[in-house]
């Protein structure tokens, strides 16, 4: 039996990555920084294949009860769910740390793919 988990992104999380890249590359006009930021986020997300519960749970409901974890990466926070039975990690959303997350769409439906 392997100790690793499959790590996947929700459709919303993939959209978040595209928006992060677009903002940094097109609004701030630093495409190299945008690429580097996405690389750092993806690297940290890939590391969730081992001991994904090592990061803190969020402290608000209903997500705390659903065991939503938060992984800080630079100025961004990756929100993800762990299914120990299926040995999967689903990245639900990726937000800028200073963003008002109370008013964000937290649909955690379909998983697009695994890394």
What function would you assign to each model-found segment?
Residues 69-70:
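A beta-hairpin/wing motif
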Residues 73-77, 81-115:
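Enriched for short, Lys/Arg-rich terminal
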Residues 1-66, 109-115:
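Basic, Lys/Arg-enriched alpha-helical interface segments
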């Amino acid at each position: 039996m392997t100790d690793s988990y499959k790590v996947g992104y929700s459709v919303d999380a993939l959209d978040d990555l595209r928006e992060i890249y677009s903002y940094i590359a097109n609004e701030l006009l630093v495409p190299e920084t945008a690429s580097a930021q996405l690389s750092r986020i993806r690297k940290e997300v890939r590391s969730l294949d081992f001991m994904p519960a090592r990061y803190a749970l969020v402290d608000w409901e209903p997500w705390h009860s659903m065991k939503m974890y938060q992984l800080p990466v630079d100025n961004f926070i990756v929100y993800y769910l762990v299914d120990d039975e299926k040995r999967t990690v689903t990245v639900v959303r990726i937000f800028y740390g200073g963003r008002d997350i109370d008013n964000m769409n937290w649909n955690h439906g379909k998983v697009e793919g695994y890394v």
